[in-house]
Every structure is written in C-alpha cells, then in structure tokens.
Amino acid sequence: MIEFAFVPHTSVTADRIEDRMACRMNKLSTLAITSLCVLISSVCIMIGILCISGTVGTYAFVVGIIFSVLALVACVFFLYFFYFSSEEFKCASSQEFRFLPIPAVVSALRSYEYISQDAINDVIKDTMQLSTLSSLLDPEAFFLEFPYFNSLIVNHSMKEADRLSREAFLILLGEITWKDCETKILPWLKDPNITPDDFWKLLKDHFDLKDFKKRIATWIRKAYPEIRLPKKHCLDKSIYKGCCKFLLLAENDVQYQRLLHKVCYFSGEFPAMVLGLGSEVPMVLGLPKVPKDLTWEMFMENMPVLLQSKREGHWKISLEDVASL
C-alpha cells in the first residue's frame, strides 16, 4: 500500500504520486524477472530430465515430471501475483485510486473545507480523474485555468442584474454536482415552458438549498456592496438567468465544461472570490472587491497558511480571510 500524508502545506501532485508508484513498480518488476527466470529454469530442468530419463530409468522420469509441474505451478502463482499487483498499482486510465488508502484520503480531504463533499464522494467511488484530484489539492494548479474562465466572466454584462445572476450561478455550482447539471438542470433549462419560479421550485425539490437565497444576499453585500439587492423572491429570476447564461454554454465548449465540472467541487463563494484576484481594476471588470495591495502571487503564496489556520471545523475561505493576509 502506497502511503501519503495529506497536509495543507504539501500538495499531492501527479508527479509525486507517479514517483511513489515507480518505486513500487520497480520492486514488482524484480519479482516478475525472478518469476520468469524460475519458469525458464523449470522448463530447462524438465527438458534435461526428459532427455536423460531414457538412460537412467522410469523413476527419474516420474520425479522430473512431478518437480517440473510443481515448479510450473509456482511460476504461474508468481506471475499471477505480479499481474494482480500491477493492476492494483497501475494508473493508466488516471482513475484508479486503489493504491491510496481511502480512509486516509477521505479524512485528509475533509480538512480542506473548500472542497465539497461531492469531490470526496468521487474519490471514494474512484470516478475522479487523477489530474483533478491533484489540482483540487493544489489550488495554484487548478486556478491556472481560471484566466480562460475569467475571460468569459468579464465579457459578461456589467449591469447589476446580470452580475447578480452570475454570482447566483457560481454559488449554485458549489451546492450541486456536475452530474446534476447534466441530468437535471440542463433539461430543465431547455424546457420552453419553464418559468424562473418553476425552475426555483425544481431546485428546492431536488437539492438541499436551505438558506440558499440568504447566502447569495450575504455574499453580494460582502463582495459587491454597490449592487442593490432585490426582494428575496426576485432572486428566482437571477438564479434562472445565471444558469441560462453560463450553464448552457458548456454544451458546445469542452474546455469550459471541464472547468465548470471542477468548479462544482468547490464550496460556495470561493470560485467567485478568486476571480477578483490579480485584477488591477476589479470594479471595472465587475469582479469581487479585494484588498488593493493583495496580488495573485501573494494569494497563492499564502494559500497554505489559510488552509493550515482553517483546518479545524467547518469553514470557507472568505474575503475576510484573504484580507487578513
């Protein structure tokens, strides 16, 4: 069993995992070579005994046959053990997590509270790509893709209602899975007869969205104080509009779809907050307000500090945490 210590200040990357796998596979290769040598030796012994059995006698022939059969059985066992072990440890499809102790992975991932339960479930079920797990544990690797996502966001309308719908959509992504988007939300959005009120009722019926509208309002007041919030029931339209604007795009854009899939693994406001980092004029771009002296480099450098200080209990990285840097 390959062991890893998941701690906030050390990111588990694909390279590190592959190095550990290579070390173990070297040992398995030695076992395979040994097994092959035993097999060859057994065949040679069998041939030799058969060759001399005519001069020595029947007894030597019987002993040779028994010895050779036992040797072949042993070789087959060793080869089967090698095959089974190599299947256990290989990661050709980048979807095998059996070489990682599942309880250790789950326990460690739960200390990263910005990662959603959906991501943890995918690890348990061996359905998450290795590169995705690596990027989730290493925020810098994940957010290297955000400039592409950012370009779609900043090209969005600067009207208050449109910005509100964008934030509602991003927060909703933190509450659902990508499978939910594909199997439920997209078909709902394609229904020509659906209304914003109907859409919100479907969301409430199928997902646990307790205090969801309140969370949207809290986030808007914190990150976008210049936006005037509508009445609570009017947020239905913002949620519906945000999904129509940003989710339907994923059908014909594979890169955007992959990024949204990853965003679903993060909880709540974290993706929206990070969009505002590294922007000299976030207000012009319609991004969340961040401290003026905080740069993208500072954020990535201090990410381990945030993770370490917030490791205990349930939490989310917020603007207050970023401001404290």
Curated annotation (Swiss-Prot):
Supply one GO CC term from the record.
plasma membrane
Principal subcellular localization: membrane
Membrane recorded as keyword = yes
Q: What subcellular compartments does it reside in?
A: Cell membrane
Q: Which UniProt keywords apply?
A: Cell membrane, Membrane, Transmembrane, Transmembrane helix
Q: Which domain of life is it from?
A: Bacteria
Q: Where are the transmembrane segments?
A: 32-52, 62-82, 268-288
Topology of this chain in the membrane: Multi-pass membrane protein
This protein's name:
Uncharacterized protein CPn_0132/CP_0640/CPj0132/CpB0133
Q: Which organism is it from?
A: Chlamydia pneumoniae (Chlamydophila pneumoniae)
What lineage does the source organism belong to?
Answer: Bacteria, Pseudomonadati, Chlamydiota, Chlamydiia, Chlamydiales
